[in-house]
Amino acid sequence: MQTFAEELEALRAEGLYRSMRVIKGAQGSRVELDGKQVLMLCSNNYLGLADHPELRSAAVFGVAFGVGSGASRLVSGTMELHEKLEERIAAFKGTEKALVFNSGYAANTGIVSALVGRGDAIFSDRLNHASIIDGALLSRADLHRYPHRDMAALERLLQDKGGNGRRLIVTDGVFSMDGDIAPLQDLVRLAKKYGALLMVDDAHGTGVLGPTGRGSGELLGVMDGIDIHMGTLGKGLGSFGAYAAASATICDYLVNKARSFIFSTSLPPAVLAASIAAIELVDSPEGKELREKLAANVALFKEKLAQAGFDTMGSETQIVPIFVGPADATMEFSKVLLEQGIFVQGIRPPTVPSGSCRLRCTIMATHEPAELEEAAGIIEQVGKKLGVV
């Protein structure tokens, strides 16, 4: 039997070993790493809210309710802040009700495995987040994965598979490693045509996309056609946790059936209060300004990369991949950039398929245009030196 140490050594030999880096201070557009200031190009803190004064103040207010929630909400009771946050999320997403989970992973595994089971069918985009796939496996429903954004292939599966059980179509709204957006209009149409529920994981769209930051569904004009809006509180909203926003019936069903909700101590008061403040801020004039600043930063950065000849893999959002290919070249690219003061992660298997390794750049509203221009120039220099462009 291969030992754990041998497996780790094999990962090192393949260039797939992972380790953590310690940063000092708060998450921001610049952080201190290994004793020097570096530009953060790998955070999902898209609007810069993780260190926003209003969220900090709200978290301090939340501590007045204690630092922990005691137990599962079904055991020790729901705190007022839980209800206030869920009411605010439901209003934000335009649904009857919402239910808060402890993380995006907990939400997806809990929602998917609760809504379907043996004899049911799940139709999932091949590039969906790992938590969706894990939820599908936990559900024991039949899992049918269609090629990325291929609606003709999905329709063939819907025609041929599923039997008489429940059908669930599930997709990322924004795909986390590619930065492209799901064809939600077509997904809504197919869900209605074939009697399926449609669930959209909008972790990377919430707070960022659409005229008022409601996400990819708002951007594409199909908010009402989505049955389950899943999203996170820890990316564009800068806090922590996740949610399902849906009909009252579905949310009540999840309270009774979603094991990741039932068997977990709930989010603490400081996080709940900060999350409420985040949604209020996204809905404010400042939120609009931040989205506009983010959009301008994204356009600038992509323009500079395109001029340098990089392949950004069809990104439509603030997630900007730079295609490299081999894992070793990708990690060398990341290493040299860090030496040059740019913190950006190389993405390797199992996160992406072998041969499709990339740098995953993420842009923030709080980046300064001059910083992004300088970063793009350094990326171009290093990319040419390494033969990527």
From Swiss-Prot:
Substrate binds at residues 18, 129, 351. Gene3D superfamilies: Aspartate Aminotransferase, domain 1, Type I PLP-dependent aspartate aminotransferase-like (Major domain). Its EC number is 2.3.1.47. One of its GO terms (biological process) is biotin biosynthetic process. It comes from the Bacteria. Pyridoxal 5'-phosphate binds at residues 104-105, 176, 204, 232. Pathway: Cofactor biosynthesis; biotin biosynthesis. It catalyses: 6-carboxyhexanoyl-[ACP] + L-alanine + H(+) = (8S)-8-amino-7-oxononanoate + holo-[ACP] + CO2. Keywords: Biotin biosynthesis, Pyridoxal phosphate, Transferase. Its cofactor is pyridoxal 5'-phosphate. CDD domains: KBL_like. One of its GO terms (molecular function) is pyridoxal phosphate binding. The modification N6-(pyridoxal phosphate)lysine is found at residue 235. Disulfide bonds: none annotated. Pfam families: Aminotran_1_2. Catalyzes the decarboxylative condensation of pimeloyl-[acyl-carrier protein] and L-alanine to produce 8-amino-7-oxononanoate (AON), [acyl-carrier protein], and carbon dioxide. Homodimer. PANTHER family: 8-AMINO-7-OXONONANOATE SYNTHASE, CLASS II AMINOTRANSFERASE/8-AMINO-7-OXONONANOATE SYNTHASE. Belongs to the class-II pyridoxal-phosphate-dependent aminotransferase family. BioF subfamily. This is 8-amino-7-oxononanoate synthase. The gene is bioF.
